[in-house]
Structure formats: C-alpha cells, structure tokens
Amino acid sequence: MAVDFTAVEAVDPTRVAEATRRLEATTMAAGGGRASLGELAAWGGWLAACQGRELPAALEHVTLAVVAGGSSTTPSVSVLAEDSLSQVGELYSSGRSPVAAAAVAQDVRVEFIDANAAAADQLSTEKASPGAEPGLEEWLAAGAAFADAESDKGTELLLLGDFGPGTTTAAATIIGAICGIEPVKVIGWGSGIDDQGWRRKVAQIRDGMFAVRDVRTEPREILARVAAPHIAVLTGILAQAAIRRTPVIFDGVGCAAAALCAQMLAPTARDWWQPASPGTEPAIVPALGALGLSPILPTGIGLGQGAGTLLALPHLRLATQFAEGGA
C-alpha cells in the first residue's frame, strides 16, 4: 500500500514574520539596532512558528539521523570501499565516528540508519510473501516510521545527513531530471573520483536521466527507477516529519534530492525544513533554488553524514538564547 504524505499543514508565514519581529524587538530593547540580528532573527522566527510559539524555545531534544545506503545503478563510480557502509556503521555503533562525537558534544542524539535493513524490517511488518524484497513503498514507509518514532519521543529538531557509495551520482540524476539540468552541470567529484571516473559518472547520470525522462513529475517513479534506497528513506523522513510538525535541518546532495521528491509528494512540506549549507556538490544549489530554500551557512563541507547540520545548529540555538534572554 502506498504511503500517503498529503496531510501536511503549512507553516503560517504570518507567524514566522511576527516571531521574527518579536525576536528583533528583544535585541532592540537591549541596545541593538533594528534588524541587528540579520538572518538569525529569521531562523528564530521560523523555528518559533514551527514550535507554535511567539518566540523560539530552547532545543533540548535534537536528533541527528544519518541515513546510509547505495545505489544499484552506480556501483562502479565511487572510490569508496565496497564495505564502506558496514565500516562506517561500525564506527557509529562503537562510538568512534567523528561526526557522532561532534553531535554528542552538542547534546545531539545520533541514529545511524541502514536504509536496506530499515526497509526489510518494514517489509516484515507487512506480512509479505517469503523471499519478497523491499521496494519503493517499504523505503518510504521506513522513513515515515522513523519520523513518527522521533516525533513520539519528543524530538524538537531533526538533523538529517546521508552517506553511501553512489549517493552523489544518484542524487545528481534525480536533481538533474526534476530541474531539467544537463548532466555536466550537476556532476561533482563525489568521493574523490579521477578524470576517468568523472567521465563515467557523466555517462551514468546521462543514462539515468534518460531512464526517467518520461516521469520527471512523478517522484515515486523516479525514486523507483534510480533505485537508491537511502534517498527514498530520506524522502519518507522529510515528508512525514512535516506531517508531524517536526522541523528539520538537512545537509548533503542526497538529502537535497530527497527534499525535491518529498516536496512533490507532500506539497508545503518544505515549510518545515532548513538546508544547512550549499554543500560542495554542484547539484545542491539548483535543488535548493527549486525548493525556494536558502541555506543557513554560506559555505559547505564535503564530509557528508550531516556534518553541516552540526555547524548550523548553534545558529538556531543562539536565536533561542537571545529569545530567552530578552523575554
């Protein structure tokens, strides 16, 4: 059964504007000039509106979800090791991941999600036939289930990142197809490919875009044909988080591709998201442009795994601290 993502309530722009003005007023009362907080007030206003408050409240329950997987259409391009997923997963489970350590230092809970395993778990709950393999709906449902679980736990802000071989190729294919951009303008160097790898990557993106040329406005079909489970799981998380009124900061080209698909599945879902940065992959900027979203940070880093969201989080927390101090 297809997951329904249509029940999204838009964030009221009037409430965003009012909360922004209130936050600016707190600093004016303390000696600041008009609009002295700049974009910080706008981010705080957005957060307050998502929280249903007049001013943004402290973020005490924040989760970083790193969704990992690969794409069956792009196995030969990435220079990542074949067992990179299990290697990175082990770093997270053993507490030796630098990204996880940085998250914990900011009082952020960390979840590492293997997209295929999560979808397989979802399939088991559906009482599928023996030998059945997870597909698109299981990937989307796994993402939605995670977003529901986080909302039920009281998560106040969700940080999203991606990881996996072939992520940049699959994401560039999706973004190029939806935005109508030629392959050479969305391709990046990904995991550190050489010139020969770049040429192969262009060919794979070109072939992938050709394969979805007739379904450019159908996100489910695009996700199914590109066959990148983690991007589909991210799509489910982003769409369902909006339904559950959980604000999200995302980072990375895989997340950007998922955001495009999620917005198509759940109109106005983008109201609940903020991109952390423009990243380092060329496909991210046109994706954010199509979404009408501006990143919190002016520059990005190429590490992935949501590292950029950990750079952006202090900005939102600073906005809540200004609100608390001026209340």
Regions found by a protein language model. Give the residues of each.
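N-terminal loops that bind phosphate or other acidic moieties
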Residues: 1-327
